[in-house]
Amino acid sequence: MASMGLQVLGISLAVLGWLGIILSCALPMWRVTAFIGSNIVTAQTSWEGLWMNCVVQSTGQMQCKMYDSMLALPQDLQAARALMVISIIVGALGMLLSVVGGKCTNCMEDETVKAKIMITAGAVFIVASMLIMVPVSWTAHNVIRDFYNPMVASGQKREMGASLYVGWAASGLLLLGGGLLCCSCPPRSNDKPYSAKYSAARSVPASNYV
């Protein structure tokens, strides 16, 4: 029962992390730039995401536009788009494996094989965690570097958006969930080892010999 509870907890954390990947990928808040003009009415905030950028006016009005070309994205966001999509696919594969290898499912009968499949699912979730950690941390590094770079104009400096924090949280959940699933070791075989039995040879009475 403890092993089943561990699997359920690991799968739940991994599913939450996978949903976090989708949310981080979809939200246009990877980079946030605030422009404050001389008049507070002209204040606006610019959001940059993987698929679109949005401008939010001080009145609350928001306008979003899809990128015309992938080449218009910075290099880190281009890599982030590819890695995030791959991470979503890998996470979906991990969930499929976790369903097949779950103790509470009847997809397979052999408990040893199911445990090995569950360990594989945990490893897949850990790979998905690394795939999202790389682009999120890379983008955060570039944002911080440009923010403290005196050569970058103040109007072009950016701050880290909510998508980065969601991505870090999703990576942590996937890593923790995958680690819990990897703790599901294959059960020991209940089959007793074969032992040869030897019996002493019976002596033949001498009367049987001619």
From Swiss-Prot:
Gene3D superfamilies xrefs: 1.20.140.150
Where does it localize?
Cell junction, Tight junction; Cell membrane
Where is the PTM Phosphotyrosine found along the chain? Y209
| Record-linked InterPro entries | Claudin, Claudin4, Claudin_CS, PMP22/EMP/MP20/Claudin
Please name the GO terms of the biological process aspect recorded for this protein, alphabetically: calcium-independent cell-cell adhesion via plasma membrane cell-adhesion molecules; circadian rhythm; female pregnancy; paracellular transport; renal absorption; response to progesterone
What is the name listed in the Swiss-Prot or TrEMBL entry for this protein?
Claudin-4
Tell me which parts of the chain lie in the Extracellular compartment: 29-81, 138-160
Stretch list, region Interactions with TJP1, TJP2 and TJP3: 209-210
Catalytic activity annotated for this protein? chloride(in) = chloride(out); bromide(in) = bromide(out); iodide(out) = iodide(in); fluoride(in) = fluoride(out)
Q: Name one GO molecular function term.
A: identical protein binding
Q: In which tissues is it expressed?
A: Expressed primarily in lung and kidney. Present in both cortical and medullar collecting ducts (at protein level).
Could you tell me which residue ranges are on the Cytoplasmic side of the membrane? 1-7, 103-116, 182-210
GO cellular component labels = apical plasma membrane; apicolateral plasma membrane; basal plasma membrane; bicellular tight junction; chloride channel complex; lateral plasma membrane; membrane; plasma membrane
Task: Please indicate which superkingdom the organism of origin belongs to.
Answer: Eukaryota
**Which residue stretches belong to region Interaction with EPHA2?**
1-103
